[in-house]
Amino acid sequence: MAGAWLRWGLLLWAGLLAWSAHGRVRRITYVVRPGPGLPAGTLPLAGPPRTFNVALDARYSRSSTATSSRSLAGPPAERTRRTSQPGGAALPGLRSPLPPEPARPGAPSRQLHSKAGAQTAVTRFAKHGRQVVRSKVQQDTQSSGGSRLQVQQKQQLQGINVCGGQCCHGWSKAPGSQRCTKPSCVPPCQNGGMCLRPQFCVCKPGTKGKACEITAAQDTMSPVFGGQNPGSSWVPPEPAAKRTSTKKADTLPRVSPVAQMTLTLKPKPSMGLSQQIHSQVAPLSSQNVMIRHGQTQEYVLKPKYFPAPKVVSGEQSTEGSFSLRYGQEQGTAPFQVSNHTGRIKVVFTPSICKVTCTKGNCHNSCQKGNTTTLISENGHAADTLTATNFRVVICHLPCMNGGQCSSRDKCQCPPNFTGKLCQIPVLGASMPKLYQHAQQPGKALGSHVIHSTHTLPLTMTNQQGVKVKFPPNIVNIHVKHPPEASVQIHQVSRIDGPVGQRVKEVQPGQSQVSYQGLPVQKTQTVHSTYSHQQVIPHVYPVAAKTQLGRCFQETIGSQCGKALPGLSKQEDCCGTVGTSWGFNKCQKCPKKQSYHGYTQMMECLQGYKRVNNTFCQDINECQLQGVCPNGECLNTMGSYRCSCKMGFGPDPTFSSCVPDPPMISEEKGPCYRLVSPGRQCMHPLSVHLTKQICCCSVGKAWGPQCEKCPLPGTAAFKEICPGGMGYTVSGIHRRRPIHQHIGKEAVFVKPKNTQPVAKSTHPPPLPAKEEPVEALTSSREHGPGVAEPEVVTAPPEKEIPSLDQEKTRLEPGQPQLSPGVSTIHLHPQFPVVVEKTSPPVPVEVAPEGSTSSASQVIAPTQVTEINECTVNPDICGAGHCINLPVRYTCICYEGYKFSEQQRKCIDIDECAQAQHLCSQGRCENTEGSFLCICPAGFIASEEGSNCIDVDECLRPDVCRDGRCINTAGAFRCEYCDSGYRMSRRGHCEDIDECLTPSTCPEEQCVNSPGSYQCVPCTEGFRGWNGQCLDVDECLQPKVCTNGSCTNLEGSYMCSCHKGYSPTPDHRHCQDIDECQQGNLCMNGQCKNTDGSFRCTCGQGYQLSAAKDQCEDIDECEHRHLCSHGQCRNTEGSFQCLCNQGYRASVLGDHCEDINECLEDSSVCQGGDCINTAGSYDCTCPDGLQLNDNKGCQDINECAQPGLCAPHGECLNTQGSFHCVCEQGFSISADGRTCEDIDECVNNTVCDSHGFCDNTAGSFRCLCYQGFQAPQDGQGCVDVNECELLSGVCGEAFCENVEGSFLCVCADENQEYSPMTGQCRSRATEDSGVDRQPKEEKKECYYNLNDASLCDNVLAPNVTKQECCCTSGAGWGDNCEIFPCPVQGTAEFSEMCPRGKGFVPAGESSYETGGENYKDADECLLFGEEICKNGYCLNTQPGYECYCKEGTYYDPVKLQCFDMDECQDPNSCIDGQCVNTEGSYNCFCTHPMVLDASEKRCVQPTESNEQIEETDVYQDLCWEHLSEEYVCSRPLVGKQTTYTECCCLYGEAWGMQCALCPMKDSDDYAQLCNIPVTGRRRPYGRDALVDFSEQYGPETDPYFIQDRFLNSFEELQAEECGILNGCENGRCVRVQEGYTCDCFDGYHLDMAKMTCVDVNECSELNNRMSLCKNAKCINTEGSYKCVCLPGYVPSDKPNYCTPLNTALNLDKDSDLE
């Protein structure tokens, strides 16, 4: 069949034959199915397939690979060949053998011919010499020798491929045997190819050529299988397992290659045809299939886009590749995999994800490919899906009209269409032709590859279903893919049964039911969209397996939603669709934990539940209520899918039904290009358009109602413009629902398998007529990123009768249903289904192999009978189920027949029915077909039903230069031509006459086929005995002058000396003009010399060491150049780069200084400029400073803080500053501050009637008695008491005198008595007693030995006797103190005749007589000053001061001071004593406690009371806490506990500044142990004495015992019976009843029995004792101090210091 165009499909399966001493022997059977042969010059069309068989026996060792022939070894085995024509058949991925070349006119025949004929053939090739005829004697001698060898071989060799007692031409003996079973290929097969038969190499995938010497990378323009004619549709090569014999496959429907898993084969076209076929696709530069022997097997997958139905032959872009490898990692697998691992199946789904961003909002979208099943047998590929160039292509765009997806966002359109989706016809274009693809081979999705690993348990697939064995065998699947691609692994399973057993494999997206009614395998996709899914078993609580609860499908945070109706078990819920489960409250389903190795408690995969410790069982999700709302649930292995009702369609995961999208209207209307802000449509187009065309192009609004077009990027826009702005989908390509009703008949649309199955599943033929086919297309919205397929009109083929008029037209294409369903094609020859007169029959998508999971069945609205075909889609097996009113019937596929007993389609055994099949061979029945196994020398006929003899003589050069005689199953060679002799192998071989020396004694002898020729020797040689010997020319004189001679074969060569070059014939040496080269003597002049040259250099250059260049002189090597700078060499010169402040000299050989002071007048403005080497200096006068610009500027001294402050302002001047002081202040000596003016230095400022008191910024005059300061404050003026005190003298006259006044009586004999205020008669002179003037009153002082004696004032207005006769130590005014006389002296007796404690009772202080003296009430006279911090009780004479408990009275300081009990060692024995105000604390070290006396620390006794353990921590104590809660003034010298700090020293404690409780709070009282154990008497000497029986310390601050709180325990306000319940105090139980113990700052009002506020400012602030230099302001329960003007608060509480003193202290502290 010369010029035949072959397309090959390949199916490989293997079986274990036997073990031998040399290793395992596998029998690999190649089922080769070529397409129809065509005459040269025609294109291939669909035709009846023919089946041929080739059996190959191969031996491999454990370390070999199945794809390499280099390891083949072992004993010979019988080899059976099947081809479709002479020349054999090519295997997939290999070039087809060249057909026999037809005889050319005038060429010599290859039959028996004479020697003259041979001479004619030789003459055509002879160039010189004469023709020489061999002698007959030589021929006879060689022939006889060969005959003897042939006889010997005939005695030894027997069997096939034996010709004349020896191996036929192209065959040799196999090692270790005497059988001619080893083919030989010359040249040998390269690149791992295998010699299948003589001169025929079977190449590895990716290589081709006669000897497999050409790789895929070298072949850039490889022709494809075939083309397409108008009115025809290309039929791709289907997998071999789907094909049948001619008898059963004459009418197989044609299918389109869209979205199917195809095998790319590139056989070489026949002669003549290759000139007419345009190459379409560059060869795919994919990786070879890597099959690792044993544990790991790799597959190379490429994502293939889903193109439109009209597809030219060949493959598409190689964009994105998946490298899939499965196997066990070393060290991680719990078992070891040997070479004999059985059939392993991997089910996966490839995906490509991308990120789409619109206006800053990005989202991910993933596009899934078809679910794919790969099978390996014993670690080797076992089906065509594992071959090289197998690709899974996912298309983002619905390319139409035969367009192909060449990249993720581009359609490669045919010549007659254009546009983004190939939807726009090109005017004037011809019919579709073959075209080139612009896509470059090997283009990947990304620049690098990501490696990901998926860990799954190895399941077992057998007749009982799919089970997971426990402990599971863990399989790591390694996937290499681009970043945007991913692979979702669904299942890795081992198919049990004997090796080589043919298992009916399940197709992607389908389910299969075995003949026993049990599920065999379902490969439905698990409902998941994760790009890198790692399936890991769940672990559930055992106790929850039998409990029922509600199943929730959504869990957001702690909220559970989408509850399924009804109750289910936790393992059923969480193992399938649920995320949470529970009855009263939901709990999240446990996560699947990743693991390495295995354990005994591992649970099952998603979709399975555990049966026992060994196996897992599929969960029937359809038993869960509400799984498929608006649809019908179909269970699959490990998952489920939904078959939706009318008006609904499946979502991308087939797990729910969603409403159908609305159809795009074809209504036309006006299209407006502009919409005004007032919603007014403007600028309509001249033609009416549909809304889709308008809004997807230039329109802004559409229709008579001015409907605004949706904005780009919105869902509404994507609905009508799927191709984006500027692209529309024409009406004939729009989607229609697949389940739309069509009249009264049903059209079965059947998805095409993407993988070979063991049984042919094609429907029988039907009649049709030549019209465009109409069918329904899928309108279901696909998953994210999956392209929506379109349906295209094809050339007229055939028609299905009784179709509605409103249908979409299409050619036999494959609209994609979902990522889990393979391609769909229409069978135009399907028989008419039984009509029903009631409701229309539903449209069923019937997949091959009976797919319940990939079909959609829409139940009729009013049909009540049971549809067995819907309930069990696989009920017929290998056939189509037709539902009948009663039961059902089956229309079986070719090769099957309907069995009434089994009610299904069973296989027909053709070998048993037809005995005449496979003559000369053996008939072997197969599922749905049969095979003819032919012996060696025979091949199957074109019909595949018989074995016919192979005429080996038709092959070229079988018997070279001899006669070939064909025999049954072999051939032989006879009768050699003249010049030839019979070889030992039975072939005619040429006689070499040139082996005889005398044949050509003085010429060269050249042997030729069948003859020889004497040719004269060429120049440089001489002839001798048929050979040409070389002549040595170098022996001749004067050869190669100026050089050396080297003899060569037939010539000589001159090697010239330096400066000379050889002539073109290399036989002479000539001078080289080096100056012509142009690269010599640069920067100089070149002069040529004989054999050399000379350079003359210019200034600044010198001759190089090689004397061939003028190189620059580096002047910078001289150190004296460029002082104060850097020397930079230049070409032929140099340059000085001077430092800053220098410049180059006139000669440019050094740097000289720049005098900036002379050249730049702007420098040093306001100062003096001094030039320096390389720079200059500026000297600025005082008050000026140097700025950045080298100028002097004024210093703003006033910017300094504190200058002239606080009693002045700073005034900046040029070069200085000036202080402007406030009134009363003057500038200091240094002029930087304002100091107070001491006005009192001038003694006259307050004259003689007072003294001056200087103040800050001023002064005041303190005037004597009788004088006062005027309003201006200058001096002291007399006070006119007579005007100020009216009636001061009564009836006497008032006379003002300086500093005082006089009362003058009108009668000179009367005198004014100040006691009575009247004038009375003068006493007689003989009264004997001299009247003394009135005693004046001044201040009484105490403790004159104190440094601050001026502050020790007892009372301000007392007489001298009242002071000195009581407790006073001195008397005076304004600190002018007159000490009191010492008791016991005459002065004291004269002043105090009655002694201490008595004062005169009358006016006169000097009257004698006891009756005139009275007891002095010191408590009344001196107030609180006489008994500070105590209670004063007057006695006669004297007084008593009663102090609080824990304090004592100091008679010198007249004050009650705290008693330091810690001075007594008996106060705290074995503990730490801490003195407190009025008491002390005894601290015991843990675990010691106080005893009953509370004065000794002892070990605690065993008791039932549990004493709290408290650790003692010491830290800093802060004495002050600001209003912002900032700690300051830490206690210096010691660290304290929290209790010690808060109760004794500070306000906060620790580095965290822990606050102490408020001192008036109960927490403080409890912390610091301040219980009140008695009451105070209001009167009497025991008023401050508590009624406690003994005086003791306060309670331990860590342990407050209850006995100290008994008096306050549970006393409520109602129990007191006191008004207001002791407000501002607490109720205390006393012997007489109850009383109030007032809080600090309050005292008890006995009349009202309430606690009233103490006005500390009026009662306690005598002589500023509370607020020193401050004003006292009373508050509720306390008081506060506000400093007087000129004073500021000090660090002492309630003490204000003068402002100057505070400033000085601040300055001192700053200095420190």
UniProtKB/Swiss-Prot annotation:
Indicate which residues are glycosylated according to the record: 339, 370, 416, 612, 639, 761, 793, 929, 1011, 1042, 1051, 1133, 1216, 1242, 1357, 1479, 1678
A single Gene Ontology CC annotation of this entry is: microfibril
Where in this protein does the record say Phosphoserine is found?
Answer: S1405, S1588, S1607
According to the UniProt record, where is the region 8-Cys3 region?
1335-1402
Residue ranges of the EGF-like domain? 181-213, 391-423, 618-658, 865-906, 907-948, 949-989, 990-1029, 1030-1070, 1071-1111, 1112-1152, 1153-1193, 1194-1235, 1236-1277, 1278-1320, 1415-1457, 1458-1498, 1612-1652, 1653-1697
* InterPro entries assigned: EGF-like_Ca-bd_dom, EGF-like_dom, EGF-type_Asp/Asn_hydroxyl_site, EGF_Ca-bd_CS, Growth_fac_rcpt_cys_sf, NOTCH1_EGF-like, TB_dom, TB_dom_sf
The record ties this protein, via SUPFAM superfamilies, to: EGF/Laminin, Growth factor receptor domain, TB module/8-cys domain
- Signal peptide residue numbers: 1-20
Q: What is known of its domains?
A: The 8-Cys3 region in the third TB domain mediates the interchain disulfide bond interaction with the Latency-associated peptide chain (LAP) regulatory chain of TGFB1.
- Please identify the protein, giving its name as recorded: Latent-transforming growth factor beta-binding protein 1
Protein's organism: Rattus norvegicus (Rat)
Q: What is the lineage of its organism?
A: Eukaryota, Metazoa, Chordata, Craniata, Vertebrata
